[in-house]
Amino acid sequence: KILTALIAAECCNPDDVVTIPKSCVGVEGSSVYLEEGEKLTVKELLYGLMLRSGNDCAEALACHISGSVAQFAERMNQRAVELGAEHSHFTNPHGLPDDDHYTTARDLAKIAAFALGNPLFKEVVSTRRAEISWASHEYNRVLINKNKMLSELEGATGIKTGYTKKAGRCLVTSCERNAMELVC
């Protein structure tokens, strides 16, 4: 999801409007419950992706950017190589298990460290709470960042938590110390 967010932040205007296709509704795992035909901005989808870990948001961004999940995965792999991620291969934008989808802590740290240089990415991953529209409801979706480090570790600046049965609990985090931003 870190690389997905980086690519979206690099190539999209945050105010671009994305119409949610049927293929991005009901995606397995964590979700913001996107609805077919719903319109959200790229920035709203980034908040859904990085705060709520919305797999549906990941696929919506992938389809918006590349036309399909498979084509977006190709773009992810190309970008990962450009960033020096030598031991990674991506098959989807959300990180759900697939035998051909893998990475390492070192590669994720390289990607995350670079991504923090993108102002939109940094803004999104450092946000503790956001509201995004929900057209079919009288209220907005309220998203609380799952990264508890933001409130429990002085100087924490964000990034991403994760969980799958196969990988277990995962965390890539960043923190400012002595005028340096550390990623681990």
How would you name each of these model-derived features?
Residues 2-119:
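Active-site-adjacent loops and short helices of periplasmic peptidoglycan-processing enzymes
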Residues 58-59, 182-184:
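Short small-residue beta-strand/loop micro-motif enriched in glycine and branched aliphatics
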Residues 68-183:
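Penicillin-recognizing serine hydrolase domain
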